C-alpha cells in the first residue's frame, strides 16, 4: 500500500476540488492510486463540489413537508445555479430529503455553525464554564474541555452537521456536496422553518380529579 503523503492529498485536491478529508479517504480506499481516487470521488459525487461552492446559487426551489399526522411541518429553501437543475429529479429528491431531515430534528435551529449568533455561543460557553465538574481544574484545561463541549453543542444546532436520516455514515453537508457533484452546480441550503402543532400555545391544565367528581355528582 502506497504511503499517503500530504503532497498526494494536495495533488488530488487540486485535481478534483474535493475537501482534504474526502481526498484522504479516497486515497486510503484506493491504496494511494490518484487516478482511482479521482474515480472514487466522482462516483461519490464529491469531486469538484468544493470548486462549485463559490459560484452564485440564485435559483432553486422552496419545498415543504408535512409529517404523518400533520403535527410537524417544514418549509425550506434550497438554492442552485439554474432553473433547469431546480426542476430536475436529483435536486427535487434532495429537497425532499433535507425537508424530512428538518422534520426529524427538533433541536436544529440553524443551517450551519457559522450562522449561530455570537450571543448564543457566549451563552453556551458561560453555561459550560460554570459546570461543577470543572471546578478546581487549571484554566488552560478548563478552556480546552469547554471548547470541545461547545463545538459538540453547536453542531447539534446546525442542520448540515446532522447525520443524514437515510444514511448515518454521512452528514447532511456531505449529502448536499454529493448531489452538487452529480448535477454539476453549486447547491446550498439557504434557510428553513419547522412548525410543531401547538408550539407556543399555553394550554390550561384541567383538574382531572375535579372533572371526575363533577361527572359523578
Swiss-Prot record:
Keyword set includes Cytoplasm: yes
One Pfam short name: EF_TS
Q: Where is it located? A: Cytoplasm
Protein species of origin: Prochlorococcus marinus (strain SARG / CCMP1375 / SS120)
Q: Which UniProt keywords apply?
A: Cytoplasm, Elongation factor, Protein biosynthesis
Residue segments, region Involved in Mg(2+) ion dislocation from EF-Tu = 82-85
Q: What is its main location?
A: cytoplasm
Cellular component (GO) terms are:
cytoplasm
SUPFAM superfamilies, alphabetized: Elongation factor Ts (EF-Ts), dimerisation domain, UBA-like
Q: Name the PANTHER family for this protein.
A: ELONGATION FACTOR TS (PTHR11741), POLYPROTEIN OF EF-TS, CHLOROPLASTIC (PTHR11741:SF10)
Instruction: State if Methyltransferase is listed as a keyword.
Output: no
Name of the protein in question: Elongation factor Ts
Q: Which GO terms describe its molecular function?
A: translation elongation factor activity
Described by its record, this protein's role is as follows: Associates with the EF-Tu.GDP complex and induces the exchange of GDP to GTP. It remains bound to the aminoacyl-tRNA.EF-Tu.GTP complex up to the GTP hydrolysis stage on the ribosome.
Organism superkingdom: Bacteria
Family, similarity comment? Belongs to the EF-Ts family.
